[in-house]
Amino acid sequence: MKFYSRFIALLGMLVAVSAFAGIPDSPQQVQPPSVGTRAPIFAARTAQGTLRTFEPDSYKKPTVVLFYRGGWCPYCNAQLSDLHLVEPKLRKSGFEIVFLSTDRPELLYSSLKATDIHYTLLSDSHLEAAKAFHVVYHVDAATLAKMREYGVDLEATTGTKEHELPVPSVFIIDTSGTIRFVYSNPDYTIRLGADALWAAAQPLATVK
């Protein structure tokens, strides 16, 4: 029994080390899942701190899952404002829309410059969901210093000392839990626009 316990503990440590070692050092190295693969299990917290878990077999609606850097990011705010134009059409077509931010739960809404948000905003401050989708990378010291110059303290906004960010990415997952669309661009200034998202989503609409 003692040997078994030690084995399990060692296995857990190896998994943890492997997961850490597998995180790229640049956004260009991330490898998100491909179209046609099963969506990973992931969880994130609401602004109230409630944990929501998403499993491949539990999707009642086709779902848009979007990873963004945080409310402090002007490009993220611009994207959320742009997608606001297509959000009513997506909902009427039967979609759920889930946005995942690195901000702590209590900062989810207060940090945003965009207003009148009707998306489901969830906190992925430890980037566990981003890791599940393989879109997370380590932020180097030079970038961290530049962010601080602009008044962005990543440790304060995430509540961690991991210094990680997601590559801004969009996934569309159907009701079977299969990924049907992927957009992931290592250049955080280039985002998927509302028209492109709507075009990608239409084939999966459950309400015509």
Predicted feature descriptions by range:
Residues 23-55:
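N-terminal "domain-start" segment that seeds a small globular fold
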Residues 1-9:
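Bacterial N-terminal signal peptides that target proteins for export
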Residues 78-134:
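Structural microenvironment flanking redox-active thiols in thiol-disulfide oxidoreductases
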Residues 8-18:
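Bacterial N-terminal signal peptides
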Residues 188-203:
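A short, polar/charged loop-to-alpha-helix boundary motif
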Residues 124-189:
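Thiol/selenol-based redox catalytic cores and closely related redox-interacting motifs
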Residues 39-40, 62, 167-169:
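Short loop/turn microsegments at loop-to-beta-strand junctions
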Residues 55-83:
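Short active-site neighborhood of thiol/selenol oxidoreductases, capturing the structured segment around
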